[in-house]
Amino acid sequence: MEIDPQLPIPLYFQLKTLLVEEILSGRYDLEKRLPTEHELCHRFEISRTPVTRALTELADEGVILRHRRRGSFVNPHWLSRRPDQPEIRAIVPAEGPWARMVRDAAGPGNQISVVEVPGHTLHHTLRHAVAEGQAPDVALLDNVWVPEFAAAGFIYALEELNEQWVHDEHEVDFLAPLVRVNRYDGKTFGVSPFADVAGLWYRRDALGALGLDPPLTWADLRLVGRAFADAGVPSPIVMPGGSRAHEATAYFLIAFLASNGVQVLGPEGVMLGSAATAQALRFLRSLVEDGLVPLDVVGYEWNQTVRLLAEGRAALSFGGSYEGEALADALGVPHPEVWDHFGFTHVPAGPRGAPASVAGGMMFAVFRQADQPGLAMRLLERVVEPEALARFARSSGRTPSRRSAIELVAPDAPFLSRTAELLETAASRPWLPSYPRVSAQLQAMLEAVLTGRLGPTAAAQRTADMIGAITGRPVVAEPEPVVVAAAAV
C-alpha cells in the first residue's frame, strides 16, 4: 500500500493505516526502532504534520511506544498473545531497577515481555490498557493509586490468588507502613518492594565549608539558603515546583504542608483552606522572591532537582529518598559512597508544626485482565524474595520492604537507619480513589503561588474548594477568632 494524495482520505490516516498493517505483518522487529518522522517524510514524500499526527495517535492508542531520545517502538503488548507460548506481560516505569527486577525474577525458563514507559505516563498507560482490554498481567504502580484501581476492579486482591502467602509472609515480614498502604477495604492489592519517604537532600561538603548544620526549621532553611547564595551557589534551594514534575511536586508539597501541621484531608473533610496552608505557601513564595529558589522550578521535570544537586548548582533539594540511586549514577560511585557526599533529613519544621516526611513507594499488582494470574502471582512473590530485594537494595540504595531483607543489607547500608527513622513518623498522602485529580490540584496550587498568579490565601481556598468538589468532602472552615470584650470598669 502506498499513500495517495489524490484520495479523499487524510494523509495522516492513510499513513496510520499503512503502519498498522506493516506492524501486523511483522515488518518491524520489536527490539528495533521504528522509522523516524524524518525517514517517513522522505519515504512517502509528505510533510511532517501528517506524520507527527499519525505517530501521536498510534502512541495514544497503545500501538507504539515513544521514548525520549530513543525513538518509537512497536508495543509488544498491543499484539495478540500466542496461544502456544504462555507469556507473562509486565509494565514498569523506565526509570529505576524495575525491569531488571522482573526479568531476574522470571528466570530463563519463563516467557516474559516487559514494557517500560516513562514514569509520568504510567498512570495513563495502565488506564488506557485496561480500557482497551489489553492490561498487563503484572504492573508496577504508585501505591497511592491502590484505592482508585481497587475500587474500579482493575486489580486482584492478592488473597484471591495466594491467601497463605499474604498471611504468612506479607503480613508478617513486610514493614507495617507498607502493609497498610497496600490495602484497601480490608484486602491486600499489591506488594511494595521498597520504602520511600519525602524529605530534604543536602550537600555535606557545602554545609561543612560554611560551618552550617542541616536546617531544622523554616527559619534555619532561609538562613542556610542565604549563606549559600552569598557563597555564589547558583540555586541554593531547589524543589519540584509545578505540573511538569507531576506527582513529585505533590509528594514534596504534602510533606511541606505537614511540616506546618497541615493535612490535605482530615476526618472532618478538606483541611487546606487554613491560615497554616497559606503560611506555608507564603513562605515558599518568599524563597523565590529572595532569590533562594529559582522561579524556574515551576518548569522542572521530576528528576531535575537532584541533577542540580549532584552537579553542585544547588546545595539543598527537596525530594524523595529514592533519588539516592540517581545521585550515585551522577557521581559515578557505588551507592554506599553517596552518603559520604550527601545527607537526607526531614522537611524542616514550620511555626505551627514539626519536622515532617511523607511515606511513598511503588507496588506490584496483578490485573484482573491477566491471561496468567497464577503465574503472575508467583512472579510477584519471586520479585520480593528477601535475597532479591537485598541485592537490588545494595545497588540502588533503596530501603527493602521486608525485615528479613533489611537484616541482609544492614551491615553494608548506612542509609537504612535514616530512612527507617523517617518512615516511622511519616505522614501519608490522601488515601482515596480520586487521588490523581487531588494531586493535580496540589501541583497547580503550588505553581500558581510560586509564579505569583494567585496569592497564598486565595490559592489555598480555591484548591480546597476544588478538592472538596472532586472528593465530595466538606471544606473545613477555620473557626473565627474569639474576641473577648473588655470588662467594664
Each model region followed by its residue ranges:
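Hinge/lid segment of periplasmic solute-binding proteins
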Residues: 144-197
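Glycine-centered hinge/linker elements that transmit conformational signals in sensory
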Residues: 225, 267-298
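Mature extracytoplasmic/periplasmic domains
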Residues: 329-332, 362-436
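Conserved N-terminal structural module of periplasmic/extracytoplasmic solute-binding proteins
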Residues: 43, 47-145, 466-489
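Extracytoplasmic/periplasmic solute-binding protein
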Residues: 189, 222-270
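Extreme N-terminal segment that seeds HTH/winged-HTH DNA-binding domains in transcriptional regulators
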Residues: 1-43
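C-terminal capping/gating helix-and-loop segments adjacent to ligand/active sites or protein-protein/ligand interfaces
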Residues: 396, 414-471
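Extracytoplasmic/periplasmic substrate-binding proteins
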Residues: 285-371, 487-488
